[in-house]
């Protein structure tokens, strides 16, 4: 399998009024501070983009883990929460992944999410760097 590099250009004011554009044109949007941080909240923000990337990658890792174990899932969903926190050392991130897996019992669902957390590149990149909580529910 080949490597892949995403290239995104960010211009303007960054997270507060900036614009992002991928080199292939598939991603093109403006950024705004959320209302909770005193911004207009009228555009996406880096935390939402990170949550979308991690959540989609994590579900792919869950599907891979299920396939490797010959487990059939009837549904997969994740609500990914990325929190921008401000502490003594400045700004940081915290994450919560709320995973729902259908067609399996709770023990299997938990085992699959634990395996996915070892497979997913976003999980690997954040491991030991930010607090991460994974809540798994069999549905």
Over which residues does each language-model region extend?
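Extended beta-strand/beta-hairpin segments
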Residues: 1-55, 59-139
């Amino acid at each position: 399998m080949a490597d892949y590099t995403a290239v995104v250009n960010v211009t303007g004011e960054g997270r507060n009024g900036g614009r992002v554009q991928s080199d292939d044109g598939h991603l093109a949007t403006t950024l705004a501070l959320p209302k909770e941080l005193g911004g207009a909240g009228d555009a996406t923000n880096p935390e939402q983009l990170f949550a979308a990337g991690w959540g989609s990658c994590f579900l792919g890792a869950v599907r891979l883990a299920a396939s490797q174990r010959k487990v059939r899932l009837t549904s997969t969903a994740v609500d990914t929460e990325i929190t921008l926190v401000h502490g003594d050392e400045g700004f940081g991130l915290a994450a919560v992944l709320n995973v729902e897996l259908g067609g399996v019992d709770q023990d299997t669902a938990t085992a699959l999410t634990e395996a996915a957390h070892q497979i997913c590149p976003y999980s690997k990149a954040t491991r030991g760097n930010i607090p991460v909580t994974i809540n798994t529910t069999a549905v």
